[in-house]
Swiss-Prot record:
UniProt KW Nucleotide-binding keyword: yes
Enzyme superclass (EC): ligase
Gene that encodes it: panC
Predominant place of localization: cytoplasm
Gene Ontology terms: biological process: pantothenate biosynthetic process
Source species: Granulibacter bethesdensis (strain ATCC BAA-1260 / CGDNIH1)
E.C. number: 6.3.2.1
Protein name per UniProt: Pantothenate synthetase
PANTHER family, A to Z: CYTIDYLATE KINASE/PANTOATE-BETA-ALANINE LIGASE, PANTOATE--BETA-ALANINE LIGASE
GO molecular function, one term: ATP binding
Role description: Catalyzes the condensation of pantoate with beta-alanine in an ATP-dependent reaction via a pantoyl-adenylate intermediate.
Subcellular location: Cytoplasm
Family: Belongs to the pantothenate synthetase family.
Residue sites binding (R)-pantoate per the record: Q61, Q153
Length: 287
C-alpha cells in the first residue's frame, strides 16, 4: 500500500495504478476506522477497483458548537486497517493541503441538504460538499463508495456529483452493524457501558416501526410512538420519520416500491447517534 501525504505523491501513485490498467475507486473517511469503513473498501475491491482511501478530519463540516478536537484520531491504527483490507493508496493530507492560504471557494447546498441533519447542523453539508469536491479533484476516481448509514449525506453527494457533472459513479454500501444491531460509528467509543447497553434500542425501534408500517397507514402516529418509546429509555430524539429515499421528503404512507427510508437521530448522553432503515434491511431482520 502506498502512503501519500503530498498531492504530487498521491498523483504519482494514482498514475501508476492507471498505467497498470486499474480502475480507481475512492473511499473518503475521517479516520478512526472500523468494520464499516472496511466494508466500503471491500465493496470496491469486489468490483475490481484499486482503492484510494483518504483519512482527513475535515474542519469545515463541524459547526461552532461541535468539538473538532474531540473527534477520534488513530492514524497508525487506520493505516494498519487499510493495509490489511487491501487498500492500494492511503491519502493522508493535512489542512493546508486541503485548504491552502487564500482558499475562497465554498458550496451552499440545497435540495437534500436542507432538512434533517442539514437543519440541525447548519453548514454541515456545505463543508461535506466542499471537501468531497476537492478530494474528487485530487484523486479523480472512476467511482466512490459511501455508507448508507449516513443516508442523507449519500443523497447530498449524489446531488453534488450530478449537478457538477462529475464523472464519478456513486455507490451506496449497506450499513454495517454490531451483533446487537447498533450501527457501527467512530463515535460509539464515547458511549459509557450503560449507554452502550441501551444504544441498540435505536435500531430495534426502527425495525418495530418498519414492521408496523407494513400493516398500518398512519406513519405519523407510528413515528410519534417510536419517539416516545426512545425518549422513555433515555434517548433524546431529534427526529424519527418516514421519508422518500431520494428526495428526503416526509411521507405519510409506506410506498409499495423501495424508495423510502425510516430515519432517526438521537442523543444518548454526549453521543449523537444516526441510523436508518430501508425495505431490504427490514426484510432481513425481525423486530
Amino acid at each position: 500500500m502506498h502512503l501519500a501525504r503530498t498531492l504530487p505523491t498521491l498523483q504519482q501513485a494514482v498514475h501508476q495504478l492507471r498505467h497498470a490498467g486499474k480502475r480507481i475507486a475512492f473511499v473518503p473517511t475521517m479516520g478512526a476506522l472500523h468494520e464499516g469503513h472496511q466494508s466500503l473498501v471491500r465493496a470496491a475491491i469486489a468490483q475490481d477497483y484499486a482503492v484510494v482511501t483518504s483519512v482527513f478530519v475535515n474542519p469545515t463540516q463541524f459547526g461552532p458548537s461541535e468539538d473538532l478536537a474531540r473527534y477520534p484520531r488513530d492514524e497508525k491504527g487506520d493505516i494498519a486497517i487499510l493495509e490489511r483490507t487491501g487498500c492500494s493508496i492511503a491519502w493522508l493530507p493535512d489542512v493546508d493541503t486541503m485548504y491552502p492560504p487564500g482558499d475562497a471557494t465554498g458550496f451552499v447546498m440545497g435540495g437534500p441538504a436542507l432538512g434533517w441533519e442539514g437543519a440541525r447542523r447548519p453548514g454541515h453539508f456545505n463543508g461535506v460538499a466542499q471537501v468531497v469536491a476537492k478530494l474528487f479533484g485530487q484523486v479523480r476516481p472512476d467511482a466512490a463508495f459511501f455508507g448508507e448509514k449516513d443516508w442523507q449525506q449519500l443523497q447530498v453527494i449524489r446531488r453534488l456529483t450530478a449537478d457538477l457533472l462529475l464523472p464519478v459513479a456513486i455507490h451506496g454500501v449497506p450499513t454495517q452493524r454490531e451483533e446487537d444491531g447498533l450501527a457501527m460509528s467512530s463515535r460509539n467509543r464515547f458511549l459509557s457501558p450503560e449507554e452502550r447497553a441501551i444504544a441498540p434500542l435505536l435500531f430495534r425501534t426502527l425495525l418495530q416501526a418498519g414492521h408496523a408500517l407494513s400493516s398500518s397507514p398512519d406513519a405519523e402516529e407510528i413515528c410519534k410512538n417510536a419517539i416516545a418509546a426512545l425518549n422513555g429509555q433515555g434517548f433524546d430524539v431529534d427526529y424519527f420519520a418516514l421519508i422518500e429515499g431520494s428526495s428526503l421528503s416526509s411521507i405519510a404512507i409506506l410506498p409499495e416500491g423501495d424508495d423510502w427510508r425510516l430515519i432517526t437521530a438521537a442523543r444518548l448522553g454526549s453521543v449523537r447517534l444516526l441510523d436508518n432503515l430501508g425495505r431490504a434491511e427490514l426484510a432481513r431482520f425481525r423486530a
